[in-house]
């Protein structure tokens, strides 16, 4: 018999930081849950007391974490690489797109730079779809913006500066009908909204650990669809990019030869699993944290997380509107995420954020407004404390 899902209140009890702060800032970062900290601490204590004697068990744990993430995203472990950031993942994606002859990528004009700048640095041309005045981006606007040169569409599952939850399935269908690569920036999505890369027919997905995932800073995740791994060359390599039996050869006299299946070096081919993109050693403690965080998310259920965040957003937006604030995206359930951004009158947004921080309320200044995030660990009292602080500090909506 399956255990009942962990409730938001039960999860909240695992975050000691919430006893001293009203944390409405998951879109920037989340506090570390106690089980995640404990897992990291056990690993670090082991290295303190035994050095790297436990290395074989670390390697096994890395494989288990990769398999855990694969279940979470509904893909195979061989399609996943661990990186240090979403931006690094998008650099890899840009290089693989270029190998396929793709030169132009369509995205939203309001995309976060971890989507756009890596692709620009990789030499790709970007075209942007502008949000409508109501803050939405209907699929027909994407379709109208396509050109004969467009080879891919890249979007964030949730927009960082507005909170718009993009219709990924509609974009996926458009990509499939036009033979375009489909790329998802999941930095604001993973651990926040359900993501199934198989159901989405995604070609790539890149994400990070420290926001909604609650796994601390420093670990990135990259999904590369198997077909891309088998038909493109590694954009770079390292000792972990070759078979284990060849990892300790010097290769000093090797020569590189390109063929249809990838690079060869004196008869040796690089691996075609996504993990070959890791090239070298990474953050073991970050992977330990990721595995523990995934366990928490599975205990709650990501669909339950989104529903809880939306419920708090409904309360928040209703009360903000009573005070004259206007969120930059609609309240409709189909586009609603755990992010709300409202323009504020007067002082720079960073100053408003700082005033709230003095009240022990954590928010963020983004896209010219105050960004308020509701996550699974939040409760109605958090929203009410924010509203009380807004009233007490005399923070007013823009245009009033």
Question: Which residue stretches match the model-derived regions?
Answer:
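Pyridoxal 5′-phosphate
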Residues: 1-400
């Amino acid at each position: 018999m399956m255990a009942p899902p962990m409730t938001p209140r039960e999860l909240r009890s695992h975050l000691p930081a919430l006893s001293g702060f009203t944390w409405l800032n998951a879109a920037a970062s989340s506090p570390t849950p106690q089980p995640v900290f404990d897992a990291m601490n056990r690993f670090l204590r082991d290295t303190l007391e035994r050095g790297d004697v436990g290395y074989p068990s670390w390697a096994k744990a890395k494989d288990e974490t990769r398999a855990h993430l694969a279940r979470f995203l509904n893909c195979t472990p061989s399609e996943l690489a661990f990186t240090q950031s979403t931006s690094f993942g998008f650099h890899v994606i840009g290089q693989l797109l270029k190998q396929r002859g793709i030169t132009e990528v369509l995205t939203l004009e309001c995309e976060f730079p971890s989507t756009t700048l890596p692709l620009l640095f990789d030499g790709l041309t970007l075209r942007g779809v502008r949000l409508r005045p109501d803050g939405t981006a209907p699929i027909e606007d994407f379709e109208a913006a396509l050109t004969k040169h467009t080879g891919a569409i890249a979007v964030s599952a949730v927009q960082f500066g507005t909170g718009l939850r993009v219709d990924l399935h509609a974009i996926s269908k458009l990509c499939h009908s036009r033979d375009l690569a489909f790329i998802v920036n999941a930095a604001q999505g993973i651990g926040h909204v359900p993501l199934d890369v198989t159901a989405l027919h995604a070609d790539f997905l890149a994400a990070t650990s420290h926001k909604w995932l609650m796994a601390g800073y420093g670990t990135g995740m990259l999904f590369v669809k198997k077909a891309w791994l088998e038909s493109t060359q590694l954009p770079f390599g390292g000792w972990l990019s070759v078979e284990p039996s060849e990892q300790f050869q010097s290769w000093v006299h090797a020569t590189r030869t390109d063929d249809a299946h990838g690079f060869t070096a004196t008869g040796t081919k690089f691996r075609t699993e996504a993990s070959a993109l890791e090239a070298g050693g990474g953050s073991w403690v970050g992977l330990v944290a990721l595995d523990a965080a995934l366990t928490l998310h599975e205990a709650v259920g990501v669909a339950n997380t989104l529903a809880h965040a939306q419920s708090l957003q409904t309360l928040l937006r209703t009360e903000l509107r009573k005070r004259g604030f206007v969120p930059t995206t609609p309240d409709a359930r189909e586009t609603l995420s755990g992010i709300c951004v409202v323009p504020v009158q007067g002082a720079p947004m960073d100053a408003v954020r700082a005033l709230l921080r003095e009240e022990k309320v954590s928010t963020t200044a983004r896209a010219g407004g105050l960004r308020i995030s509701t996550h699974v660990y939040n409760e109605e009292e958090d929203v009410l404390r924010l509203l009380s602080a807004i009233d007490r500090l005399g923070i007013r909506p823009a245009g009033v």
